[in-house]
Design a protein with these regions (language model features):
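Active-site flanking residues adjacent to catalytic metal/cofactor-binding acidic residues
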Residues: 37
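Short, surface-exposed ligand- or partner-binding patches at beta-edge/loop junctions that are enriched
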Residues: 86
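Rhodanese-like catalytic fold shared by cysteine-dependent sulfurtransferases
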Residues: 1-34, 42-82, 91-128
Length: 128
């Protein structure tokens, strides 16, 4: 059986999903229809907060929650919506963004890591 390494999966994801800079992210957020998705674990969100206006969907649930016919889908995403995905360091978000592309979503981007966002001056809010 041929298997892929995690490194190979990340390389593939990073080739398909653009990782945005902070400035590119802010431009999309301010000027387009954008959904920000936090794929970190509940404890990470609880302890550190969340990017302002982001939706929390843990990495392990993203494919289930964002299916168009899912009764648990928290957001309406159309073809014009930009989807920005982030985690703690940019690895889980790369894999999650690749999964969203595989599901047929368009305009999916890797926002990178939460700490990177905070260090760049990005707005956050406590987990609500």
């Amino acid at each position: 059986m041929q298997t892929k390494t995690l490194e190979a999966l990340l390389i593939e994801a990073n080739e398909l999903v653009k990782r945005l800079s902070y400035d590119e992210s802010i431009d999309l957020i301010n000027n387009t229809q954008t959904v920000i998705i936090d794929v970190r674990e509940e404890s990470e969100v609880y302890n550190l907060g969340i990017i302002k206006n982001a939706i929390h969907i843990p990495r392990g649930l993203i494919e289930f929650k964002l299916l168009p016919n899912s009764p648990n889908n928290p957001v309406l995403i159309n073809d014009d919506t930009n989807i920005l995905v982030y985690c703690a360091g940019g690895y889980r978000s790369a894999l999650a963004a690749k999964s969203l592309l595989d599901l047929g979503f368009k305009n999916v981007f890797n926002l990178g890591g939460f700490q990177e966002w905070v260090e760049s001056g990005g707005e956050i809010q406590p987990n609500v």
